[in-house]
Swiss-Prot record:
EC number: 1.4.4.2
Record function comment: The glycine cleavage system catalyzes the degradation of glycine. The P protein binds the alpha-amino group of glycine through its pyridoxal phosphate cofactor; CO(2) is released and the remaining methylamine moiety is then transferred to the lipoamide cofactor of the H protein.
Broad class of enzyme this protein falls into: oxidoreductase
Name of this chain's protein: Glycine dehydrogenase (decarboxylating)
Gene name for this UniProt entry: gcvP
CDD domains associated with the record: GDC-P
Species of origin: Bdellovibrio bacteriovorus (strain ATCC 15356 / DSM 50701 / NCIMB 9529 / HD100)
The organism's place on the tree of life at top rank: Bacteria
Amino acid sequence: MKIADLSPTNEFIPRHIGPTDSDIHEMLKTLGFNSLDQMADKVIPAQIRTTHAYADVGNGISEHGLLNHLKQMVSKNKVYKNYIGMGYHDTITPTVIQRNIFENPVWYTAYTPYQPEISQGRLEALLNFQTMIADLNGMEIANASLLDEGTAAAEAMFMAHSLCKNKANAFVVSPDMHPHVIEVIGTRAEPLGFEMIVMDPAKYDFAKPVFGVFFQYPNTNGTVEDYAAIAKKYKDHGALVTASTDLLAMTLLTPPGEWGADMVVGNSQRFGVPLGFGGPHAGFLATKDAFKRLMPGRLVGVSVDSQGKSALRLALQTREQHIRREKATSNICTAQVLLANMASMYAVYHGPAGLKKIALRVQRLTAILSAGLKKLNLEVGAGHVFDTVTVKTDKAAEIIAQAEKMQMNFRNYGGGKLGVSLNEATTLEDVEQIWAAFNLGKAAGFTALSVDESLADVTLPANLTRSTAYMTHQVFNSHHSETEMLRYIHHLQNKDLTLTHSMIPLGSCTMKLNATTELVPVSWPEISKLHPFAPTAQAVGLIEMIHDLEKKLCDITGFAAVSLQPNAGSQGEYAGLLVIRKYHQSRGQGHRNICLIPSSAHGTNPASAALVNMQVVVVACDDQGNVDVADLKAKAEQHKDNLAALMITYPSTHGVFEEGIVEICKIIHDNGGQVYMDGANMNALVGMCRPGVFGPDVSHMNLHKTFSIPHGGGGPGVGPIGVGAHLAEFLPKHSLVPEAGPANGISATTSAPWGSASILPISWAYITMMGAQGLRKATLVSILSANYIAKKLEAHYPVLYKGKNGLVAHECIVDVREIKKTSGIDVTDVAKRLMDFGFHAPTMSFPVAGTLMIEPTESESKKELDRFIESMVTIRKEIAAVETGKMDKENNALKNAPHTAQMLMKPEWNHPYSREEAVYPVEWLRGNKFWPVVGRVDNAYGDRNLICSCPSIEDYQA
C-alpha cells in the first residue's frame, strides 16, 4: 500500500455525508438503481446538467489542512485596538457565554422556534432579550431581534409610514445619525417613493408634511442631546419619532420612551458579541404596545399549554411574510437569534448593576481621555458625551498615521475632525496610548491616574440622566456567579431539541451538519476582533478569503459575480430585485414593475417584491405543482411592456425538478424581463447544475442552508446573490468602504460592507474541504435520502408531487389531508406526536396546506433515516386505530401529544392508551428519550392575552 492510498484520518467528506458507501448502495437498491449517477439521470433534467470541471472549487482538503491554511490566510490581518465606534465596539464576551452558547451546538444548530413545545429554552432567552431591550429603551414592547441597526432603522421607517395618519411621503433624518444607517434607510426609501430629508430636525419648517423623524442617541459625534422638545414638535405635526440608541448608554441616559420616541432601534453588539468585521449582530426594534401588530420580525409571547401551564411561543405570526405575503409588515424571515441570546445572557450575567458599572467606567475613562486631550491643548468637541470624544486638528493625517503605527484605529470624520470611542475593554494604559498618538508619538507627560484623581465626578444634567429602574425582573438579578450562569444556560438548553439530538427534517430549510472545523475560526481574534470600518489593509487576509469565497460561489453557480453583503435570504431577494430594477433603469425602462410569482412561492418572494415597489402578478401551478407554462406565457405577454421579473424557486417549492425551467426563463427574457431564482433549494443543484448557465439572471444562495452556516435557533443567516455579467455592475456597494462593491451598484442594503462577514469562513471552509467531488456527492446523497424516505413512506402516506420519472428532488411532501377526513387527525397532530418520538416536525402546511415537507439532507445516516421512517409508520398505525374506531377520535395519543414527564406522573390517567404507549411508542426510545417540557401550546390564547416581556420569568416556570 502506497502513501497515496492512505488518506488523512480527518478527510472531511465521509465526516459530512451521513450514509456510508454500503448504505448508499442499499438505499439505491431500494429505489431500483445501481449508482448515484443512474439515479441522477432519472431525477435531473438532462438539459440543465453540467460537465463543468469546477476548477476554482478545487479537490478538497483535510480538516487539519483547512485550519492551517485559513490560519495562514487570516494571520495577514492586523488586529488593532478599535476606537472607531459608529455602533461597533470592542466588547468582552464572558467566557461562560462564549463556550456554552456561541460555541455550543445545542444553541447554534437549533431551528427557528416554530415548534414551541421543543423550543422553550431559546424562547425564554429571547423573552429575556425583548424585556432587556424594552426596559433599557423605556418602551413597552420589543421584537426578538432584527438583522442589524441599519435594517432595523429601515423597518422603523416603513412602520412609521404605515402608522402615520397624515398621508405624508417624506421623513427627516438627522445628519448626526451614523452614515451607514442613513445609507440603508435611503436604500429602502427610494423604491417606495419616500423622500428622505437629511437635515437638522430642529430646523425643519414643516412646509411639507412628514411621517417621521430619526435621531441617533447619543449621536454619531458622541454628543448626548435633549430631543424632548423637538420630538414633541414632530408629534404635534402627526409624525412618528424614532431613536437609534446605544444599549450601554441607556443604563445612564434618559431612555427615549421618556422623551417621546415612538420607536427605538439599534444594535446589541456591545453586549458581549464580537465585532466580527461587521456581523452577525442582533439589531432590535422596540415600540409602544399599541403598535405591536405593525412590528416587523418575530415576537415571543407567553401562552399556556394543554395542562394550563405557562409556555412561550412565537406570537402574532399573522403579521409575517409566510402568511401575509406581499401585505406583510416586512419581508424578514431570518432574525439573529444566536446573537440576541448572547446579548440577553450578557445582560443576565452582569445584571442591571453590573451593566451600569461598565457604563460608568466607560464614561469615566472618556472624561479622563477628554481632560488629557485638553491638557495637550487640543480642540475637544463640546457637549455632553458618553463614550466618544472628538478633536479638531490640522494634523489629522499625521495623528491617524501615528495611531495606526501604535496599532490603534481612530475615526476620521474628514475636515480635520477625529473621533475616539471607548469601550469596556479600554484601560487607563490605553488612554495614555491614545494621548501619545495625538501627541504624535510622545508621551503626554502625565498619567491617566493623575488626571482621574484631579477630575470631578462626571455628571449629566437632570434632563439627560436616567432616573427609572430597568431590568428589575428576577432573571436579571439571580445568575451572577459563573456556577449559577452555567446552570441557567444548561437549564434552558435542556428544553430544546436540536441537531445534537436528532434529524431536523424541515423541508426548504436544509438542516445539514454544521461541522466543528468550519465553526472554530469564527472565534479567532484575527476574525472576531476586526472593526467593519477599519482600514481594509488591516483585514487583507479575511478579504482574500471573502474574494475566494465569491470566486468559488461563481464557479458553483455559473454566475459572473457575487455579492456577500445581504445578511439573510430575504435580504438577498431584496438586493437581487433592486439590482434588476437598476438594470431596467439603466436601459431607460424604469417603468417595468410587474413581478410574476408562482402561487406556490415562499412568502418572502411577494413580500420582497412589494418592498421594491413591484406589482405582484400570481402565476398558476398545475396539479403536479409545476408552474403552469401556458399561464406564465399568457401573463408574460400580457405584461410584456412592463414586465420586470419572474421570481421562481428551483428545484420547485414542491421539491421537484421542473422540466420546463429553460423554456420558462426564455419566455421571460423574450418579454423583456429578468429571472430571479430563489436559491432556497440549491442543495439539490450544487455540482450537478449551474443556474447562471441554464437561464436565471440572478439568484440568492442561503449560506445557512446549502453551505453549512448554522441556523442558530433562527439566525444568523447569509443570503449572497449571484448575477449574470450584465448585472454585475449593479451589485450592492457601500459608501464607507468602496472596495466592497462596484461604483455603479445599488446603495448598501446592510450596515456592514460585507454583511455578516465573520461567519463567511464557515461556508468557505465547507466548500474548500468538500471540493468539487464532495459537493457533487453531497447533492446526490441529499436527493437519494429524500427519495429513500418517499419510497419507504408511500405505502403509508400519499407522496404529493413527483417528477416525470416518479422521483423527487431533495425533499418530499407527504399528504395528510385525506387522513384528516377519515380520522380527524391533522398535520399539527402528526407534528406534535413526532416530538414524542424525539423528532422535530417536518415543514407543516407549506407549500400545500395539510401536508408535511420532509428534507433529510446528506448529513443524516441511513440509521437516522430509518428511525424517522419507523416513527412515521408507527404514527400511521396509530391513525389507523382512530380510523377503525379502536381509538377515540379526540382522546388519543396524537391529539394529546406531546406528552411531558409531568403529564405522565399525574395520579390520574384518563386516556384509552397506556402511559407507556404515550412516551415509548417505539422500543429504541427507552435508551435515549427527549422529553418536551410543556404540553401542546395554545396559540390562540397567546395572541388574545399577549405578554411579550416578563414581570418575572420565573413566574412562568411555575
